[in-house]
Amino acid sequence: MFRKPDGIILPNSGYKNLVVYKKSDVLYQGTVVFCQRFLPPYGDRTVDQMTQAARSCKQNIVEGSSVAATSLETQIKLTNVARASLAELLEDYLDYLKAHGDMEWSIDDTRKNNARDFARSHADWNDWKPVFISCPAETFCNLMIVLIQQCRYLLDRILAWQEQNFKENGGIRERMHTARAENRCENWDKILYSMLELATTPADLESRLATLCEFARRSAESIKNRKGWKR
């Protein structure tokens, strides 16, 4: 269960602490290197499509983290955009493999299992750069596919958490409404108490209490009539 926030603005831990951001940065940097090594420098729209998709994933994670404190709804939308960008990037790498007669590593392939293990424990670009500047295109594509799959898994988990958080805490509008309502209730309690506190005798106290009860009864009837509620 998520703890109800004490204030209207939710805490924000920062995107640079997220493993999914670090992996998305590797995806972006790696895609730039891939395009430089294996795609024509001019006249190929695939270069723009791939780099834009990789950048979109990374930037939407950054923007989603930036708005997390004030708008959970917007954060969820941005996380979905980041995930969709990953799907586009994955398709581009799969298309490259097909176009060049290469294959995606199967789930039982030792190379894929080794790549998964390496990717789980290495989320920094400096760990991947030496590999990407020297490996052949087929290996490059399959490594990127593994990274995309892990990044997508992390985004799915984050998205599930964000949606649950939104259900329990609401957006900023809901939190502001709750804060105003709680403030009104607190002020109303003080007003009622002060009215009763002014009583000079037990009989006066009972009279004041009866007056307040009658006011509450009439107010309730007025609300029922206004809302069209039947008795």
Predicted regions and their residues:
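Amphipathic alpha-helical assembly/interaction segments
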Residues: 1-231
